[in-house]
């Protein structure tokens, strides 16, 4: 899949934390929280992305997977490695991880109708988490799937599978706390771009397959964390 120049994504950024936060606030105003037209018909391809680090953080490892939407069958897996662009700064995860994620995206042979990213969407201090930033620069519908709360408040969902409650930030809903597996902590689900709050929840639920994480980010997480290297060897023709 081709995308615009990765170097141009941060064009004009002076590298400062202050400017990065200002850019986040500006970009957040362009986020669309309505379902993309491709989601109104039945999407056929889903993608999942996650990031890990090597060499004591000096190398960023991004994993991308492509799968069928109908049966969650894994079609492609890819891992790319790039030099880490900046140290970890709370709230600026996308500036650290996005270059690697976009490189991983270019490895996909087909364009997904919906993307799941490990991290937050609009459930973020400036409404531009990694999933929102990724969706905006790629113009792809995107959902953020996070293991921990970053911002906002929510009532703990019930203990049954599928129970969910809204995440509120300053009185506005920015996501869902979802009990994706019994006896596990809830996931933090938030729309990234070109998808509604409701659809972000329902698509995540559709992609649950007995594990805490939905399949797109679960498979990407296994690769990014090196737990899923067998997956790569199982699909040699796609790498």
Curated annotation (Swiss-Prot):
Task: Please name the InterPro entries in this protein's record.
Answer: Endonuclease-V
This enzyme's EC code(s):
3.1.21.7
Mainly resides where?
Answer: cytoplasm
Question: What are the residue positions of the site described as Interaction with target DNA?
Answer: 88
Q: Which Pfam families match?
A: Endonuclease_5
Q: Per the record's keyword annotation, is Membrane included, yes or no?
A: no
Q: Which positions does UniProt annotate for Mg(2+) binding?
A: 50, 118
Which keywords does this Swiss-Prot/TrEMBL entry list? Cytoplasm, DNA damage, DNA repair, Endonuclease, Hydrolase, Magnesium, Metal-binding, Nuclease
Per its Swiss-Prot or TrEMBL entry, what cofactor is needed?
Mg(2+)
Query: Mind listing the GO molecular function terms for this protein?
Result: deoxyribonuclease V activity; magnesium ion binding; RNA endonuclease activity, producing 5'-phosphomonoesters; single-stranded RNA binding
Per its record, the protein catalyses:
Endonucleolytic cleavage at apurinic or apyrimidinic sites to products with a 5'-phosphate
Which leading EC class covers this enzyme? hydrolase
Q: Does the keyword DNA damage apply?
A: yes
Cysteine disulfide links:
none
Q: Name one GO biological process term.
A: DNA repair
GO (cellular component) term, any one:
cytoplasm
Annotated compartments:
Cytoplasm
What family does the Swiss-Prot or TrEMBL record give for this protein? Belongs to the endonuclease V family.
Entry's PANTHER family? ENDONUCLEASE V
Q: What does this protein do?
A: DNA repair enzyme involved in the repair of deaminated bases. Selectively cleaves double-stranded DNA at the second phosphodiester bond 3' to a deoxyinosine leaving behind the intact lesion on the nicked DNA.
Which protein are we looking at? Endonuclease V
